[in-house]
Amino acid sequence: MNKVLIAAAGTGGHIFPALAVAEQMRDNGWQVDWLGTQEGRLESRVIPAANFPLHSISMTGVRGHGLKRKLFMPFTLAKAVLQCRRLLKTLQPQVVATFGGYVCAPMGLAAKLLGIPLVVHEQNAIPGMTTRLLAPRANKVMLGLPVALPQWQQYPVVGNPLRKGLLAQAAEQTEKSNTDGALNILVVGGSLGAQVLNEAVPEAVKALEGVELNVLHQCGAEREATTEKAYLGASVLKTLKVTEFIEDMGDAFKNADLVICRAGALTISELAVMGVASILVPLPHAVDDHQSANAKVLESRGAAVLLPQTEVVEGALKQQLKRLLHDRQQLWTMARFARQCAMPEATQRLVNECMEYRQSDD
């Protein structure tokens, strides 16, 4: 049986694109093993639930940590490479595919030491540290979003793999043309919520007049009551639903006329494939400010408005909402431009690349 080892750890932005590829590889008859970290809380829940064998190594990052960890990093990396080398000798995969997180560095290096083909996928518009390390050593590098840096122009942009359910909903999505009635606003701060959006969006909505809105606001854990209270006095509200978590994001995107959210790589790809106008507020402390670069992918195509968090706090969100919500044609134009950025074949393209290294049938 053909085997692939997938390495992805830490955040959903790394894990969920890898999971989409893993599921498709399994459907194609491949055995899939997964590498995470011993501290990886997300992969320790998600990967076994998807019925993939999960292996782990002792590997930690250096960003945001003290000098001691940085000084010991060469030894930590060498130890992790040896662990990965042993694992690869045991599993004997035909190909290794990395999707981000610190486990990818030692696994990618171990794969090259053993002569195992290495496929690297980078989700963000600014490549992460492990991608920068592995790209010169990889057999194939594929990008989820365009990277503006000149040295990355040689690599193909294939898009970010997305969940099957969301892609199915996107295929059924019709072009938006809500010419009258209430407009639907979706506010998403990520799985943990975003306090700045919980405060700024209600204030901006209360300043509106002459429109009617249905607002669905995902606020994060234990913020439901205070966020809902912040909307008191908003005369333009037809309906308001504040929730800690949205189970079906595909349905939420499908019904939205405008989304106000952060600018993670998967969010950018989901907005594009669903064809929705957006106001993007990048997380200001993201590594290498990669969310601002992600947001510019849609902004540069006329599909989104980019608002730095400092401007949101200073009240710019009010002006943008007034402008967009009183010009429905502008919203539909942005939605159409967003759809033009979509790359729904990302999963299949990555799967095809990995399958290039399958065993001969002879």
UniProtKB/Swiss-Prot annotation:
GO BP: any one term: carbohydrate metabolic process
Pathway(s) per entry: Cell wall biogenesis; peptidoglycan biosynthesis
EC number: 2.4.1.227
Localization of this protein: Cell inner membrane
Pfam families registered for this protein in UniProt: Glyco_tran_28_C, Glyco_transf_28
Binding-site positions, UDP-N-acetyl-alpha-D-glucosamine: T11, G12, G13, N124, R163, S191, I246, Q291
GO molecular function: UDP-N-acetyl-D-glucosamine:N-acetylmuramoyl-L-alanyl-D-glutamyl-meso-2,6-diaminopimelyl-D-alanyl-D-alanine-diphosphoundecaprenol 4-beta-N-acetylglucosaminlytransferase activity; undecaprenyldiphospho-muramoylpentapeptide beta-N-acetylglucosaminyltransferase activity
Membrane disposition: Peripheral membrane protein
Alphabetized UniProt keyword annotations: Cell cycle, Cell division, Cell inner membrane, Cell membrane, Cell shape, Cell wall biogenesis/degradation, Glycosyltransferase, Membrane, Peptidoglycan synthesis, Transferase
GO cellular component: plasma membrane
InterPro entries: GlcNAc_MurG (IPR006009), Glyco_trans_28_C (IPR007235), GlycoTrans_28_N (IPR004276)
Catalytic activity as recorded in UniProt: di-trans,octa-cis-undecaprenyl diphospho-N-acetyl-alpha-D-muramoyl-L-alanyl-D-glutamyl-meso-2,6-diaminopimeloyl-D-alanyl-D-alanine + UDP-N-acetyl-alpha-D-glucosamine = di-trans,octa-cis-undecaprenyl diphospho-[N-acetyl-alpha-D-glucosaminyl-(1->4)]-N-acetyl-alpha-D-muramoyl-L-alanyl-D-glutamyl-meso-2,6-diaminopimeloyl-D-alanyl-D-alanine + UDP + H(+)
Protein family per UniProt: Belongs to the glycosyltransferase 28 family. MurG subfamily.
Task performed by this protein: Cell wall formation. Catalyzes the transfer of a GlcNAc subunit on undecaprenyl-pyrophosphoryl-MurNAc-pentapeptide (lipid intermediate I) to form undecaprenyl-pyrophosphoryl-MurNAc-(pentapeptide)GlcNAc (lipid intermediate II).
Name recorded for this polypeptide: UDP-N-acetylglucosamine--N-acetylmuramyl-(pentapeptide) pyrophosphoryl-undecaprenol N-acetylglucosamine transferase
